[in-house]
A protein has these predicted regions:
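N-terminal hydrophobic or amphipathic helices and topogenic motifs
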Residues: 1-66, 70-71, 91, 231-271
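Periplasmic-binding protein-like
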Residues: 2-5, 9-10, 78-93, 185-221, ...
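Bilobed "Venus flytrap"/periplasmic-binding protein-like clamshell domains
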Residues: 5-28, 88-158, 233-242, 250-252
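Generic non-transmembrane alpha-helical segments
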Residues: 27-32, 109, 218, 222-231
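Short helix-initiation/N-cap motifs at beta->coil->alpha
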Residues: 36-50, 81-82, 140-160
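Acidic, polar ligand-binding/catalytic clefts
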Residues: 49-109
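A ligand-binding cleft/hinge motif common to bilobed small-molecule-binding domains
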Residues: 60-72, 134-135, 163-164, 168-188
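Hydrophobic, well-ordered secondary-structure segments
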Residues: 127-141, 151-163, 190, 197-199, ...
Length: 271
């Protein structure tokens, strides 16, 4: 019998927030009548290892990873960020951040400086950034930045790299940015948002492709009904979410469109 696991490490910006996510998913699982085991150190494994685990029960995963078929998983439900730009939908975007004392007033002002991105499997840290930059390229200006630091791996590393002056601009998941600004404001006090990308489907909780249909259905129903439960309000306030929504069947198609557009333009990597 499979011991199904859960994890929300993508958005565990502080120990308090991770505890909140754990509490929420445990309550959802209880409401669903499903037994899930929380694995706190899941993201110490490589993405490839996580994606190919057959015991994923409710684990947060980037939609771009799903879209490019790197992970054979079933999308269960995605959080609805408590943000004006989300407008009550399970969507997110990337904030392009710089230091508050940087001279830049527009994105174009950063061209020629040093940028960074996280990983080629990331929507918020790579694909969205690349798509946003695509509109600024011209035949005469194929590369926008003087230097690009690749594979910084995480939003936290982008944030720290901007704070410490290792890069001048970089993309961070806007929902992650909201959370860390609320719960660790000292880390973003010297940072400002210069621009933001278009919104796309929010990273969902997923189950392994071989997970029982009944289990997935129960979890999906419990996630989407969570906001109506008496226990939800305090956790929603902590995690800055309004509830959960089931992703549409084509929720991540737009991510692939952005990927194709960039590659057809010869823009394989943000530059």
């Amino acid at each position: 019998m499979t011991d199904w696991i859960m994890n929300a490490g993508m958005y565990a910006v502080t120990p308090e927030v991770e505890a909140g996510w754990r509490d929420l998913v445990e309550r959802v699982a209880r409401d669903a009548g499903v037994t899930l085991t929380y694995v706190p150190d899941l993201w110490t494994q490589s993405l490839d290892e996580i994606c190919h685990r057959s015991d994923l029960g409710a684990v947060h995963l980037c939609g771009y990873t799903i879209a490019v078929k790197h992970a054979a998983v079933i999308a269960i439900a995605a959080p609805i960020p408590r943000a004006i730009w989300a407008a009550g939908h399970a969507v997110y975007r990337s904030d392009l951040i710089v230091r508050k004392d940087a001279p830049y007033r527009t994105l174009e002002d950063t061209f020629g400086a040093r940028a960074g991105w996280t990983a080629t499997h990331s929507q918020s840290g790579f694909n969205a950034f690349r798509h946003h930059l695509l509109a600024f390229r011209t035949p005469q200006r194929q590369a926008l930045y003087g230097e690009v630091i690749a594979n910084l791996r995480s939003a936290r590393n982008i944030l720290d790299s901007v704070r410490e002056g290792h890069i001048d601009i970089g993309p961070v998941d806007a929902y992650w940015h909201m959370l860390i600004t609320r719960h660790a404001p000292q880390l973003t006090a010297d940072i400002r948002i210069l621009a933001s990308t278009e919104v796309t489907a929010m990273p969902p909780f997923v189950a392994a492709a071989g997970a029982p249909t009944e289990m997935v259905t129960r979890l999906r129903s419990a996630f989407t009904a969570a906001a109506t439960q008496p226990w939800f309000k305090s956790l929603g306030d902590l995690l800055l979410i309004e509830g959960f929504a089931q992703p549409a069947a084509d929720a991540f198609a737009r991510l692939l469109e952005w990927d194709r557009e960039a590659k057809m333009a010869g823009f394989e990597l943000p530059a």
